[in-house]
Regions:
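C-terminal beta-strand-rich structural cap/linker in extracellular carbohydrate-active enzymes
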Residues: 551-568
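Active-site groove signature of glycoside hydrolases
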Residues: 253-278, 367, 372-379
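Loop/helix patches that line or flank the sugar-binding groove of alpha-linked glycan CAZymes
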Residues: 373-376, 387-514, 520-525, 559
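Conserved alpha/beta catalytic core and glycan-binding cleft of carbohydrate-active enzymes
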Residues: 177-178, 183-184, 188-214, 291-435
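Acidic/aromatic-lined carbohydrate-recognition and catalytic surfaces
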Residues: 59-250, 261, 268, 272-320
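Sec-dependent signal peptide cleavage junction
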Residues: 44-57
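Beta-strand-rich binding/interaction modules
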Residues: 524-547
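Bacterial N-terminal signal peptides
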Residues: 34-43
Length: 568
């Protein structure tokens, strides 16, 4: 949702140094003749570090870097953001106890901002008996492992000073079985006589959950020492809340007000597909209720919901009127982005998918904001899906960060962290900051059976390597921030320039348009812009694997394998 206010934020791009690619050609392309390649090398400086528009500030040079200048970036003051998902326990430890905390996140805001992220999603921070904290024991507090409510308030203030939106996980589908509400209800049930009915006036908390004398299905678990069962879809330690109850809603409204007052800019609604199983109408009503309540507290409030389903179901949930749903159609090893990055999904099909989302989602909510992502805390890492192929990992990141809406990047994706196996603990490993400095290093979650998973080096190593995955992400995020049309523009397929190997999409926001051209194959592609009516546009920026520039001869651009070109 566009706002009129604008805030300035200068972000630094990565510095590229040439490095030869590793991939072997695997797809058809119209290749430039040798003499043309030589001409482009001479005229366009093919292989040199790319350049951005000039500002007064020039980056300092380190060993192996090339001097370059940067364009000042103006971030629109709206809910289109580049989000960084953080599992606090595994991110950065500020006090030496080997558990990440809120102050650790605050200490890494320079890094997060420098990367080009303009939003942060914190996985649950509320008190909980488990390491992941999706089973809450107090909706109005911070888990002592992570810090205090004042630590959160300061973090929110620090984010606001940097124009970074801070959202938190809001798991309202269930509580912990150790929550005082559930404990009180179970104690009451244990005192009932055989056959005696529940009296909610005697114990209001008995109405907060779904209790039954019958074990209605496998998701119902016995209340010890009673004839009663309770619903817990995920497991027995997470009893489902009865979200139909007004008393429950009043409790959750108190929680929402608490976090908004502390400085949260939005909520990620966990497990929204399961508020009531197979009841889209009820679930969307719950989302609408919570969103409307939060908007009363903060007119700029943002909400993104977890609807782990396909495009058509996600479209139905946009009928709630809430702004964003995670786009699971794009995510995970078999999602469209990773498949395209490894050459198993055509460039044209990817553009067709963009148009399809736009049509389906906007029909339900004209102010929709897509929430694309590659992976999250419940999925394997992108590097695993791509068998640690550095070029493919970069390409996947480039595709994600040129999608419309608000992309979400899971911490560690920017350095190619890995997480083999099916255990959730293995997907939430300690952030790999340095090989030589243990400061801030956390322990892996208890139960994880593998150590740090990265074939590409730590943050420290990759920062000094201009062609690293990290610096590729920095360039991609910077390109996104320099061109607000990428996130906000209405998409139109450039039919004449859409093939299996390459494709172009036009993005229009207000009176400004850009074109995004993708070459997802391993081979160079010669693309005649005139065929798509784009010949009047100039190259605005590019993403290439090793810092190559995209050459242009009259109306023809020569795109290296696995590259993205922005035209304006």
């Amino acid at each position: 949702m566009e706002k009129s206010g604008m805030k300035k934020q200068v972000l630094r791009p990565g510095i590229k140094k040439p490095e030869s690619g590793r991939r072997i050609g695997s797809g058809p392309a119209r290749l430039l003749p040798v003499f043309c390649i030589i001409l482009l090398l001479a005229v366009c400086g093919y292989g040199a570090a790319d350049t951005a528009a000039q500002t007064e500030e020039t980056l300092s040079r380190e060993e192996g870097e090339t001097e370059r200048t940067e364009r000042e970036i103006v971030i629109p003051d709206d809910n289109y953001r580049n989000y960084y998902e953080i599992f606090v326990a595994s991110f950065y430890d500020s006090d030496g106890d080997k558990t990440g905390d809120l102050n650790g996140v605050a200490q890494k805001l320079d890094y997060i901002q420098d990367m080009g992220f303009t939003g942060i999603w914190l996985m649950p921070v509320m008190p909980s008996p488990t390491y992941h904290k999706y089973d809450v024991t107090d909706y109005c507090g911070v888990d002592e492992e992570y810090g205090t409510t004042e630590d959160f308030r300061r973090l929110a203030e620090d984010c606001r000073e940097r124009n970074i939106r801070l959202i938190i996980d809001m798991p309202i589908n269930h509580t912990s079985s150790e929550h005082p509400w559930f404990q009180a209800a179970c104690e009451y049930l244990a005192g009932l006589e055989a056959g005696e009915e529940i009296d909610e006036e005697a114990c209001p908390y008995a109405g907060y959950y779904h209790f039954s004398r019958e074990q209605e299905n496998e998701t119902y678990h016995p209340v010890p020492g009673t004839e009663w069962y309770y619903e817990g879809v995920f497991w027995s330690g997470m009893p489902d809340l009865n979200l139909e109850k007004e008393a429950v809603r009043r409790e959750l409204e108190k929680a929402a007000s608490f976090w908004i007052e502390l400085g949260a800019d939005g909520f990620r609604m966990d497990a929204a597909l399961h508020y009531e199983e197979n009841d889209t109408a009820f679930n969307t009503e719950v989302l609408r209720w919570m969103y409307d309540y939060c908007l009363q507290q903060n007119p700029d409030f943002y909400m993104v919901s977890e609807i782990w389903a396909g495009e058509k179901t996600i479209a139905d949930y946009y009928g709630s009127g809430t702004p964003s749903m995670f786009n699971f159609d794009l995510a995970d090893a078999e999602g469209k982005l990773i498949k395209a990055a490894r050459g198993k999904y055509s460039a044209e099909s990817l553009v067709d998918a963009m148009i399809s989302y736009q049509e389906d989602f906007s029909a339900r909510n004209p102010e929709w904001i897509d929430a694309p992502f590659l992976t999250n805390h419940d999925m394997g890492r992108t590097a695993n899906a791509l068998i640690s192929d550095e070029n493919d990992v970069k390409m996947a990141g480039g595709l994600l960060l040129t999608m419309g809406g608000s992309p979400f990047v899971y911490y560690g994706e920017e350095i190619g962290m890995r997480s083999r196996g099916t255990k959730d603990e293995n997907k939430r490993l300690s952030m790999y900051w340095s090989d030589t400095d243990e400061t801030g290093r956390t322990l892996d979650p208890t139960g994880a059976d593998e150590g740090i998973g990265s074939a590409f080096g730590s943050v420290e190593e990759q920062l000094s390597d201009g062609t690293s995955i990290l610096n590729y992400y920095r360039r991609a995020l910077r390109l996104r921030n320099e061109n607000p049309e990428i996130a906000r523009g209405t998409a139109r397929k450039v039919e004449a320039l859409c093939k299996e190997q390459y494709a172009a999409v036009l993005k229009t926001w207000g009176d400004s348009s850009i074109a995004i051209v993708y070459n997802i194959s391993d081979e160079e592609a010669e693309i005649d812009l005139k065929e798509g009516g784009l010949e009047e546009m100039e190259i605005r920026g590019s993403l290439t694997l090793n810092g190559e520039e995209i050459g242009r001869t009259q109306d023809v651009i020569c795109m290296p394998g696995q590259s993205v070109c922005i035209l304006k």
